[in-house]
Amino acid sequence: MKKVFMISIGLFLIGCKGSQERSIVINAPINEVWAVFSDLGGHEHFTALDSASLSPSGEVAKGATWYVTQGKNFGKSEVTVVEPMKKIETKLIETSWPVTKWSETHTYSGDSESTEVSWKVDFTGKGVGNLFFPFFNAYLGSDIKKSLKNLKKIIEG
């Protein structure tokens, strides 16, 4: 019993690391998919987010700030990598969610017929959130999958 208690305390203090990645093929040229998915300020249209914005607004650029909200929670990330038609990476700056680290990688590959989009999130839990870590990890994977299906529906019509 003492061992279980010590392990629980350790996880609570250190944090749990997780990673979720999902992909989908969208029947549209890569430039059409890029135009929608790279618009980080428009992610509220196909995700569970209540709002999303990019500063400065417009085309995504390295150094831009991506601000999202969901309910009472918010997240503020910096865009760290932009390779047009290939990749976008972001890294968490500040959040009210129970995580200490959060980074996203969106990758694109395709041609004039179809595009594969991959969405990967790496994160580390914080505090009480670690107690629910397995559930949050599973939920995140499901949420990414649902968001990609919504994206596909929006683009394919």
Tell what function each PLM region has.
Residues 14-55, 153:
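Hydrophobic ligand-binding cavity/cleft-lining segments
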Residues 22-24, 75-81, 102-110:
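Hydrophobic/aromatic beta-strand elements that line small-molecule binding cavities or substrate pockets
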Residues 29, 36, 88, 140, ...:
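Stable alpha-helical elements in mature extracytoplasmic
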Residues 32-37, 43, 66, 79, ...:
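Hydrophobic pocket/interface hotspot
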Residues 38-42, 84, 145, 149-156:
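Sec-exported extracytoplasmic/periplasmic mature domains
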